[in-house]
Amino acid sequence: VGLPTVSAPSETPTALAEDASPAPTGGWSRPLLALAKLALSGGLLAFVLRGTSLDALWQTFRQVRPAWVAAAMSMHGLMVAVSVWRWRLLLDAQQIRVPVRALTESFWVALFFNNFLPSNIGGDVVRIADTARPAGSKTLATTIVLVDRVLGLLALLSVGALGAMGARSLGVDIPGTIWIEVGALAALGLCVLLFFTPTLRNLAFKPLHAVGHPWIAERVAVLQETLDRFGRRPTALAGALAGAVIVQGVIVAFYALTAQSLAISLPLVMAGVLVPVALVLQMMPVSINGFGVREAVFSFFFVRFGLGVEAAVAVSLLGTALIMLFSLGGGALFLLRRH
């Protein structure tokens, strides 16, 4: 489903011209890295499953309750709605008007690519492609998606840091979680640098200008103009950040409801400790879409919560299956676009 053409923001004089210059080309394949990630994911899953009873795991899955599954799926739908609202706030801040329905369809297709490709980059490419025409600039559309990502990262790391502190208060000490707190502070510093300290930001971009390549210079100019406009609209940034925090809360509720669907009592407070930490750790580019890492982290927490490894694996796998099932709707929309 295509997006309607709307006027580009008047504050971007270079937006339309920038795409006329040829882009530098290049690329390489990384099959060895992909194989290493696959091996790690498989190894972690095998390690976790080694300590489980497959019969007990099957019995857990047999207890699934459809009403609770529907409730969990509704949380995923709410997550999409809030995410689209965040995205629209950032587009509006750049004077780009795109209908909510078009953004929702684009985000849903992006979810499909995120869940069925080995990284999240494919989904971002979809979102950029769908908004480049209304924005009048691929660079502008890319910058907006990247800002959305940075704010989402700040929210995730902040909630993850709170989760790590909550785990310590419950007597669950996770080695290395101090780096989540360091990461949250670093993400906050990055946001301040990007949006509210133009002098320092321009110094950071100076090496790119020094390259002297017209293609790079044009895109850096659009990037700086876009960040300047965001800096003049702090309420839009605050709203998008608040939306990102809400998304993290909704994901916590999704996993708590997924556990309930399996007759596993995972209190919301415990889910609020477990899920953010798991999400942060599975961001590490060492596995295929977090497989293995997620199950290992869930097992670590569930054992300490007295719930058992089988329950951890069941909740993790069912949650992943529901997310992938939901994202199949995006795959259907993608096929409709092609016809």
Language-model segment annotations:
Residues V1-W108, G166-M283, V309-H339:
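Predominantly cytoplasmic-facing regulatory/coupling regions of multi-pass membrane proteins
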Residues D92, T104-R133, A217:
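Extended non-transmembrane interhelical loops and adjacent amphipathic helices
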Residues R101-E105, S119, G123-D124, P134-V150, ...:
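Membrane-interface alpha-helices at helix entry/exit sites of multi-pass transporters
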Residues A110-S119, P276-F291, E295:
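Transmembrane alpha-helix interface/packing and boundary motifs in multi-pass membrane proteins
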Residues G123-A132, I288-R304:
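Re-entrant/interfacial helical elements at transmembrane boundaries that shape
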Residues R149-L154, T320-M324:
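Selective transmembrane-helix segments that form parts of the transport pathway or gating/packing helices
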Residues S158-L170, R304:
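Transmembrane alpha-helix termini and helix-breaking/packing motifs in multi-pass membrane transporters
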